[in-house]
Amino acid sequence: MLNPIVRKFQYGQHTVTLETGMMARQATAAVMVSMDDTAVFVTVVGQKKAKPGQDFFPLTVNYQERTYAAGRIPGSFFRREGRPSEGETLIARLIDRPVRPLFPEGFVNEVQVIATVVSVNPQVNPDIVAMIGASAALSLSGIPFNGPIGAARVGYINDQYVLNPTQDELKESKLDLVVAGTEAAVLMVESEAELLSEDTMLGAVVFGHEQQQIVIQNINDLVKEAGKPRWDWQQEAVNEALNARVAALAEARLSDAYRITDKQERYAQVDVIKSETIAALVAEDETLDENELGEILHAIEKNVVRSRVLAGEPRIDGREKDMIRGLDVRTGVLPRTHGSALFTRGETQALVTATLGTARDAQVLDELMGERTDSFLFHYNFPPYSVGETGMVGSPKRREIGHGRLAKRGVLAVMPEMDKFPYTVRVVSEITESNGSSSMASVCGASLALMDAGVPIKAAVAGIAMGLVKEGDNFVVLSDILGDEDHLGDMDFKVAGSRDGISALQMDIKIEGITKEIMQVALNQAKGARLHILGVMEQAINAPRGDISQFAPRIHTIKINPDKIKDVIGKGGSVIRALTEETGTTIEIEDDGTVKIAATDGEKAKHAIRRIEEITAEIEVGRIYNGKVTRIVDFGAFVAIGGGKEGLVHISQIADKRVEKVTDYLQMGQEVPVKVLEVDRQGRVRLSIKEATEQSQPAAAPEAPAAEQGE
């Protein structure tokens, strides 16, 4: 019946278990991977036949987190999981990126990978587990796949690399790096860091790749025991005669077209050449497949660009290999936003804004690993007009979510701590033109917009996208790649950071054989490019503005006695609601007695502070206050003495002679001097008019607690 095959191995501080043959036996392959109570069930289904006319590889990766994995019921209205969250989308991309290049060229059968998180230990992130599961399932499936891959997370604590750190360890770590690769080569890196050096980052990549070899070995052993027979798939034979005929018609013309430096002009010319070539060939032989001709033309394009770069000739737009496109940097471009910048690099342009809000604007993320609050939001929008196309405009696609997260990682390391700058900050990058490296333009624009908004970031940051063309032992690293160089090259390598170090590194490698030395050259060349861009940015704005925008809320902070919090909030929030309406401010109170008052108008903030100080003022026994009669009863009168405090003047304490009727001496609303005789344990205040009038000292207002005020 059920006959599971299991492999267990130690991976750093965790025990990993791979199990197959137990569940989902109708899928092409299925694996349950667990790492110290975090378990992910991964299935792979591949279609044996490709759809007719299919001209691209339809790989789909779905990653889904089930709340039952953490012993919870979904909080949504329907109490079930809905569309993928941003976190799920990012992990799906993390799985997709290293496995996609390992399918053979020409393989266009549909393949779907589904990773479902079924159990979660809050200390062990499921992303690495899911990547290992996808690698194992694809390797077991028999589908043409040049894997397996391994995956590792690397931390950097006390100047030491840590393999697969726990969530608690990650809080202490200066690095959060995920690396995936085959036995021979690194394929993907995704990381954020606290401005670490190039050597430290490269060391982490190499360390992670070395450590994950045990994963690859164990997957290979599992495949020997339980793997399905390899599919009998053969790449279609190359039609040499047809290739030569297409090259004769188009190669020289395409070579000339790729000397046109303007992107739109070049694309138009390339389209003309392709359509004329296909039309001429189909006229000669009607049986020819237009898709096949298109693929041959694409291969010729790729060869034209690559051979020119390898020969040391100028690039598509006429630049040398390490040249950056022309930069145009402007700040304060939108009058009413809190901070704005327009960053243009060649034909790539980002309009970036920064908006300041209060702590209640922070995003609450209800994640499988636990609830957390994010006070720095980064949103990236890529409208179709940025590449001169029409298209759907709506909720962000996977690519936009991924690029937004990368840009956020680039800026996160320089953001001020919440206790020093108590604002929620939202950065939005609108890509208005795109020809390569728009996510890195977003990093540069974000740094400028944050400075323009007066956010005290620790340093300016810039980002750069690098490319690589490699044939045999000959390789060239390209700085600031164009969109075409990204598609036609062998590596996409994005680095963001300040003058002092790297804040984010993302690598996607399409070929094997990228050595440590090549990565070192790319990182060093990226550093030079980054410093050049920072130099240009500093000419526009070299430090955060001294003050935040007049349109941004100013946050004033005062400290009150924690015992007085209930007085400021009032029954059912009545006092704080009334204060908010009366003063036109936003008031937030923390458990330690910190009160934050946010207002766009300084006078309103001062009014709110004054009112809170009145409410929280301590009443001093023996002190005389000016009061107002609020209620008259048979046995005396209640007098308000400021700050919402009220005390009783007993009938015997109204005058130094016998008082028959209170109203003979006091009227509602009458202002009278009163002396505090006693405050009992329940906070009730006894007052005396008689003793106050006997003493000649002037009346005092309630004394307020010391207030610390910052903006």
Swiss-Prot record:
Pfam families: KH_1 (PF00013), PNPase (PF03726), RNase_PH (PF01138), RNase_PH_C (PF03725), S1 (PF00575). It is found in: Cytoplasm. It catalyses: RNA(n+1) + phosphate = RNA(n) + a ribonucleoside 5'-diphosphate. InterPro entries: ExoRNase_PH_dom1, ExoRNase_PH_dom2, ExoRNase_PH_dom2_sf, KH_dom, KH_dom_type_1, KH_dom_type_1_sf, NA-bd_OB-fold, PNPase. PANTHER family: POLYRIBONUCLEOTIDE NUCLEOTIDYLTRANSFERASE, POLYRIBONUCLEOTIDE NUCLEOTIDYLTRANSFERASE 1, MITOCHONDRIAL. Keywords: Cytoplasm, Magnesium, Metal-binding, Nucleotidyltransferase, RNA-binding, Transferase. Gene3D superfamilies: GHMP Kinase, N-terminal domain (3.30.230.70), K Homology domain, type 1 (3.30.1370.10), Nucleic acid-binding proteins (2.40.50.140). Signal peptide: none annotated. Residues 690-711 are annotated as: Disordered. One of its GO terms (molecular function) is RNA binding. Its main location: cytoplasm. The keyword Cytoplasm applies. The keyword Nucleotidyltransferase applies. Residues 694-711 have a biased composition (Low complexity). GO terms for biological process: mRNA catabolic process; RNA processing. Its EC number is 2.7.7.8. Residues 622-690 form the S1 motif domain. Belongs to the polyribonucleotide nucleotidyltransferase family. This is Polyribonucleotide nucleotidyltransferase. Residues 553-612 form the KH domain. Mg(2+) binds at D486, D492. Transmembrane segments: none annotated. Its cofactor is Mg(2+).
